[in-house]
Amino acid sequence: MKHFFLILFGISSPFICLATSVEFNVTKGIKASITWVDNKKVEYEITGSDRVAKRGYYDVDTENNIHVKYGDYNFDGKEDFVIWYTDDGMGIYDIYRVFLYSEKMADFKEIKPSCGDDFINLNLNKKKRELISLYYSHNEAQRCITNV
């Protein structure tokens, strides 16, 4: 009976948390490490020349799993990143938050779409340097183009 209680407690313990992380080179000599825990907060650290340059975090308000991808989202040759998750409603849209690396600030800066509140189902048009997403106006899906 003791072993059963220990196994049951170990499985259902509220103190278990899952952390996931990704590391990437932002540009030559600059690295970023991004960690997300329990779908509530994304923490990041930027390092250069073997020292920490910046640390920060972003709160995320979702009940769904958080995903992080890195890539060049403003087409400047430096790696940026996005946080994305499925919407909390019917779960049919992906919500993206876009963070661009600013060499001037030596930090990531969140950008917003040109229309609507969020980047929904984000796509990139590298040729035209556009971020393409959806937004809703009067309950109708519209195409939003954000130039970067």
Question: Whereabouts are the PLM-identified features?
Answer:
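Terminal domain-start segments
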Residues: 17-71
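Beta-propeller blade repeat segments, especially FG-GAP/WD-type strand-to-loop junctions
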Residues: 47-49, 92-113, 147-148
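Acidic/hydrophobic-patterned starts of short beta strands in beta-sheet-rich repeat architectures
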Residues: 75-86, 129-132
